[in-house]
């Protein structure tokens, strides 16, 4: 299985087997994880429901229980905006440097779900940005002025591609 990722991760290796998202799948947050990770979990939950029809529950506990978990965790040891994404036949683990790293790991998993649906190939991805500032410059002075809802949608799209700055002129 060959998948396209934008931007291309720093390290990518495929394994044997697949992980299947189904009705028993859950998104798991450690009870000590920062509250900001919940928004990344909600984003992933919405993507899974849109693409597969399954709506995994979001759980917070000290210890994960069961298989078919999508485990989101923050690790301050990773460099800024870095993450690892491990898809095994049993579980998916995203470990990121606080909120931004976990969010970028979720965005990579969203790209996988859009290409493969509910049956994901096993993969190990380790990624960190090649450039600290990745921006989009939008000249809003010519033509129609963008609405707030359009700018929010644009920010979401830029986040999907791991662009971390939006500049309006």
What role is predicted for each listed range?
Residues 105, 148-149:
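Short, solvent-exposed loop/turn and secondary-structure capping segments
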């Amino acid at each position: 299985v060959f998948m396209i990722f934008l931007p291309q991760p720093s390290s990518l290796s495929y394994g044997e087997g697949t992980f299947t998202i189904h009705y028993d799948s859950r998104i798991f947050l450690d009870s000590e994880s920062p509250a900001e990770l919940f928004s990344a979990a909600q984003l992933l939950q919405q993507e899974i429901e849109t693409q597969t029809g399954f709506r995994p529950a979001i759980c917070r506990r000290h210890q994960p229980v069961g298989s078919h978990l999508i485990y989101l965790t923050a690790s301050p040891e990773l460099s800024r905006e870095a993450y690892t994404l491990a898809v095994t036949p049993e579980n998916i683990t995203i470990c990121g440097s606080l909120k931004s790293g976990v969010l970028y790991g979720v965005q990579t998993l969203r790209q996988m779900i859009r290409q493969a649906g509910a049956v994901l190939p096993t993969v190990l991805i380790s990624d960190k940005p090649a450039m600290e500032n990745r921006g989009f410059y939008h000249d809003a002075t010519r033509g129609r002025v963008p609405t707030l809802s359009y700018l929010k949608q644009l920010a979401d799209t830029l986040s999907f591609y791991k662009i971390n700055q939006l500049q309006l002129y």
